[in-house]
Amino acid sequence: METGFGWIEVDGMRYNHDIVIHADRTITKRKKKLSKGLKGEYGHTPIDDTELGFLFDEKPALVFIGTGQYGDLPVTPAAEQLLKRYIIVIKPTPTILPLIGSELRKFAAVLHVTC
């Protein structure tokens, strides 16, 4: 896995948007529109609990949150509360990629690719 400002590459596929790696290892585009209404409050579209509902069905042992190239993605208190049900790792996206690459447990990840 590799990342740079505005992109991430996973398994040879390049994505020019935020992604979610699901517990079954499929990859989808992050549904940040669900959190867009909070942009004014945070100055940036945060990650909110409304985006994390998929975790209930997937039941990962671990959740990774990649907070962007510089670690600027805000995590709302509601998201933090929901994430307390899981082992979580929240770090800048470039820092978190090696951890994801070596993880053997069932996990999910939300990865921000810009700031």
Model-derived features with residue positions:
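N-terminal, charge-rich interaction modules
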Residues: M1-K36
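Flexible, charged surface loops at secondary-structure boundaries
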Residues: M13-Y15, L55-K59, G101-R105
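Short beta-strand segments
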Residues: H22, G66, V110-T114
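Compact, glycine-rich, soluble single-domain proteins
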Residues: T28-L55
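Short amphipathic alpha-helical segments and helix-helix/interface helices
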Residues: L52, A79-E80, L97-I100
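Mid-chain, well-packed structural core segment of small domains
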Residues: F54-I87
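A short glycine-rich beta-strand->turn/loop micro-motif centered on a GG-aromatic cluster
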Residues: I87-P98
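Short basic, glycine-rich beta-strand/loop surfaces that mediate nucleic-acid
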Residues: I96-C115
